[in-house]
Curated annotation (Swiss-Prot):
InterPro entries: GIY-YIG_endonuc, GIY-YIG_endonuc_sf, Slx1, SLX1_C, SLX1_endonuclease, Znf_RING/FYVE/PHD. It comes from Drosophila melanogaster (Fruit fly). SUPFAM superfamilies: GIY-YIG endonuclease. GO terms for biological process: double-strand break repair via homologous recombination. Its EC number is 3.1.-.-. A zinc finger (SLX1-type) spans 196-249. Belongs to the SLX1 family. The lineage of its organism: Eukaryota, Metazoa, Ecdysozoa, Arthropoda, Hexapoda. It is found in: Nucleus. Keywords: DNA damage, DNA recombination, DNA repair, Endonuclease, Hydrolase, Metal-binding, Nuclease, Nucleus, Zinc, Zinc-finger. This is Structure-specific endonuclease subunit SLX1 homolog. PROSITE patterns: GIY_YIG. It is an enzyme of class 3 (hydrolase). GO terms for molecular function: 5'-flap endonuclease activity; crossover junction DNA endonuclease activity; DNA endonuclease activity; zinc ion binding.
Length: 297
C-alpha cells in the first residue's frame, strides 16, 4: 500500500533529484500573504527547475513570475509531482489539475468541480490531485509525489498505485541534467544479440525497435513490441506497461527507465532548449482556484 504515513516518508528525505534524463514537474503554490484577500490561495504550474521557479514567482512579473501570483505572495511551493516522461504529458497533467471540471479524464468525479464549503484552497487542490493519481493514463506513470513543506503533509484519501513514490525534501537540478549533449558521458557499449530473445526473429532496424535490460550485465535483446507484450502479460486491455521482470535475468524493470536507457544509447540530445522556457503565458497558466465557486450546503 502506498498510502501516506509521515513515518514512512521520514526515511525518504531527499535534498536533490539526480535524474539522468529530464525533470518535468507540476507544482502547487500556497500564498502566505498577510492580506486576507490572498492568504491561503493556491496556484498550479509546470516547471523544469523548481528552485528557480519559486524565486521568479516571489520576485514578480518583471523577473519571470506569473501575472496572477504577482503581488499576492510571498508564495510557498508546498508540493510537486514529477517523473513525467516529457513536458507534453506534464503539461496535460497540469491542465487537468487546473481545470478538473473540463478534463474528460475526471468526468467521473463531478464533486471535483467545486470547492466544498469551509474547504481550504489547499485541501481542494489536494483532493483533486488524490483523484487524478488513480486515473489513467497518470496512474500508470512512474510518478513521485514530493512534499516540499512538511507543515502541509497529510495522508492521501486513497492508496496510490504501488509503483508511485511519496517522498519529502527539496529539489535541485543536478549538474548532469544541465550538461550539454556534447559533454555528456556516453553509456558503456552493449553486446546486443542479432535476434529477439522473445520472438526469435532477426532484429530489423534495431536502432528504432530494439530494447534491452537496465542491468548492464544482462544481454537481453528484444523488439520493443515483444517486450511490451511480455510485460503486459498480466494486464490485459493495456498497451503500455508499467514494468515487470526481465525475461532473462529477472531484474525488476521500469518501462520508463527502459525508454530512457534507449535514448541514452542512441545519443538522442536532451531538449535543453525548453528547460528555461517555462515563463510564457501558454505554459505558466494559473489554476484560477482563488475564483472557484463553492458548493452550497
Amino acid at each position: 500500500m502506498n498510502s501516506y504515513d509521515p513515518q514512512d516518508t521520514a526515511s525518504q528525505q531527499e535534498e536533490s533529484v539526480a535524474l539522468k534524463g529530464h525533470f518535468y514537474g507540476v507544482y502547487l503554490l500556497c500564498s502566505q500573504s498577510l492580506d486576507p484577500r490572498y492568504r491561503g490561495k493556491c496556484y498550479v504550474g509546470f516547471t523544469v527547475n523548481p528552485k528557480r521557479r519559486i524565486r521568479q514567482h516571489n520576485l514578480g512579473c518583471d523577473f519571470g513570475g506569473a501575472r496572477k501570483t504577482s503581488r499576492k505572495g510571498p508564495w510557498l511551493m508546498v508540493m510537486i509531482v514529477h517523473g513525467f516522461p516529457n513536458n507534453t504529458v506534464a503539461l496535460q497533467f497540469e491542465w487537468a489539475w487546473q481545470q478538473p471540471s473540463l478534463s474528460t479524464r475526471l468526468k467521473m468525479y463531478p464533486e471535483l468541480k467545486r470547492k466544498l464549503p469551509r474547504e481550504t484552497f489547499f485541501d481542494y487542490n489536494f483532493r483533486i490531485l488524490s483523484n487524478m493519481l488513480g486515473v489513467g493514463p497518470w496512474n500508470r506513470l512512474p510518478l513521485t509525489v514530493r512534499w516540499l513543506e512538511t507543515d502541509y503533509e497529510r495522508p492521501f484519501s486513497k492508496a496510490l498505485p504501488k509503483h508511485m513514490e511519496i517522498v519529502s525534501g527539496k529539489v535541485s537540478i543536478s549538474a548532469s541534467q544541465r550538461r550539454r549533449p556534447d559533454d555528456a558521458v556516453p553509456p558503456p557499449p552493449v553486446a546486443w544479440a542479432s535476434e529477439c530473445h522473445l520472438c526469435m526473429q532477426e532484429m530489423e532496424q534495431p536502432e528504432k525497435s530494439r530494447l534491452g535490460c537496465t542491468n548492464q550485465m544482462c544481454r537481453l535483446t528484444c523488439h520493443m513490441v515483444c517486450l511490451a507484450n511480455y510485460l503486459l502479460g498480466d494486464e490485459p486491455g493495456h498497451y503500455i506497461p508499467v514494468g515487470g521482470e526481465c525475461p532473462l535475468c529477472e531484474t525488476r524493470l521500469s518501462w520508463a527507465a527502459l525508454l530512457q536507457r534507449k535514448r541514452l544509447l542512441l545519443g538522442v540530445p536532451e531538449e535543453l532548449q525548453d528547460h528555461d522556457e517555462d515563463l510564457s503565458d501558454d505554459i505558466d497558466v494559473d489554476s484560477d482556484i482563488e475564483d472557484t465557486p463553492e458548493l452550497s450546503d
